[in-house]
Each structure stands twice: as C-alpha cells, then as structure tokens.
A protein has these predicted regions:
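Aromatic pocket-lining residues of Rossmann-like dinucleotide-binding sites
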Residues: 243
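N-terminal cap/recognition module
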Residues: 65-106
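N-terminal Rossmann-fold NAD(P) dinucleotide-binding loop
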Residues: 236-237
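Glycine-rich Rossmann-fold phosphate-binding loop(s) that bind the pyrophosphate
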Residues: 232
Length: 244
C-alpha cells in the first residue's frame, strides 16, 4: 500500500523508489508487530523528504559564455538533528538519485549515534574538464542560491562525488561572504580554515574498519588477506592506505 502510493506520487524516480522498497522489506516484520507505528504513520512520514529546493545555477565559463545548470538540496529528515549530507557535482545527478541518497543518509547518520539528520544536494554540473576558475565561479553561483537554507543548526553539507576540499572551500568562502559568519556550516573543509586533520582519509579508513568488523563476525582475521579496490578517488585511496 505504501509503495503503491509512492509509485503513483513519484513516477519514474526508480533509484528513490528502489531504496525505499528495500528498507520497507527489511523492517516489514517488526513494523507489522507494532500497530502503533501504522497509526502514527511513521513510515509515511519517514519516506517523504521534509522539503526539496530546486534552483537554476547560472555561471560564466572561461570563454565568457553563460552556462546554466540545475541545483538541488533535499532536506530529508531532521528528527534527531540538523540535516547532514554531501553535495554531489556530476552530470548524472537528478532528483531521484538525491532523494535516494538523502533517504539512506538519514539511517547512516542515525547509526553514528550523533545528533544528525539526513540530507543530500548537488547539481548536474560536471567538474571534469573545467578550469579551476570555472569550478570556482560555479561553486559561488551555486552557493548564491543555497546559502539561506544552510546553517550549523539547520543544514550542514559536505563533499561527495565531484566535490572535494577545493570545492567545499569555494562554497564555504561564498557562504562566509554572504552571511558574514564563520560557523560550522560545512564539513570537509581544508585544514587551513577549520577542517579536520584526518578528514581526507576518513571514508576509506571507515570502509576498511567496516570490512574488518564483518569478517570478525565470521571469525575471520583480515590480516594477510588481499583487498580488491575499484578506482582511486576520494574513498579508494584512503582504503588502500589503510589496507597496506
């Protein structure tokens, strides 16, 4: 019933609908044992984002030509804390993907036991093949539209695919200029302006810690094992460093 309603409301959003379906199937037995959950419409409230911002990002490339992209911020759930989730810059970005990521980010952040909600944002802008100046102008234009919806007690973005320390720095710089505040509104910043010492390695290290815990539940020691890693981006290099 819940999935049928979602499919009717959000046709074509395959990534988002698949993520919701997988979660619902995993909690079905427990949910059915608690009729009070259904009475309070817990699932219906959990699977829909609190709000979504969609906006045009207009910027000028190195040839002096005006370019336009779409920007998004999905503030999915802040039941236990401010919205928290990365910003992704990639040509494949669309609302369905960001809703799926924001939905799963809610659970991911809850598992940390820290007071963080779930959110996700991004744009169909691709940094690949762009100059530093073009990326800076895009990040500033992106933040010009989004800044009023962010804050340390409201929504705290981070990096993601296509968004590293450089891009976070450009966006945070614009945010500071617009708000006239130096607050903890972004994570993933450079060390020079408030970043964490081990942030670059954190995701890759965490992946290895997770794999090690999985193996330990089966009585297997990770020492001496061969680790296969695909790619060599923000996550892979940290995982490779920890694996060696």
């Amino acid at each position: 019933k819940i999935m049928s309603s979602l499919e009717a409301k959000h046709p074509g959003e395959s990534e988002y609908l698949q993520a919701v379906k997988e979660v619902l199937l995993s909690i079905e037995d427990i949910y059915n044992q608690h009729p009070e959950f259904e009475k309070a419409k817990i699932i219906e409230r959990l699977v829909e984002p609190d709000r979504i911002f969609t906006f045009r990002v207009t910027w000028v490339d190195d040839k002096g030509e005006v370019q336009t992209n779409l920007g998004y911020r999905v503030q999915f759930n802040n039941a236990i804390g401010p919205y928290k989730g990365g910003i992704r810059f990639h040509a494949s970005v669309n609302l369905s993907i960001l809703k799926f990521l924001g939905f799963e980010q809610t659970f991911k952040n809850a598992l940390t036991t820290l007071p963080m909600g779930g959110g996700k944002g991004g744009s169909d802008f691709s940094p690949r093949g762009k100059s530093d100046a073009e990326i800076m102008r895009f990040c500033q234009a992106f933040m010009l539209e989004l800044w009023r919806h962010l804050g340390p007690d409201m929504d705290v973005p981070a990096g993601d695919i296509g968004v590293g320390g450089r891009e976070v720095g450009y966006m945070f710089g614009m945010y500071k200029k617009l708000t006239r505040e130096f607050t903890g509104t972004f994570t993933g910043k450079g060390l020079e302006f408030g970043g964490s010492l081990i942030r670059p390695e954190a995701t890759g290290f965490g992946g290895l810690y997770f794999v090690n815990q999985m193996l330990q539940t089966k009585g297997i020691d990770i020492k001496g094992k061969t680790v296969a890693i695909s790619g060599f981006g923000n996550v892979a290099w940290g995982a490779a460093t920890k694996a060696t």
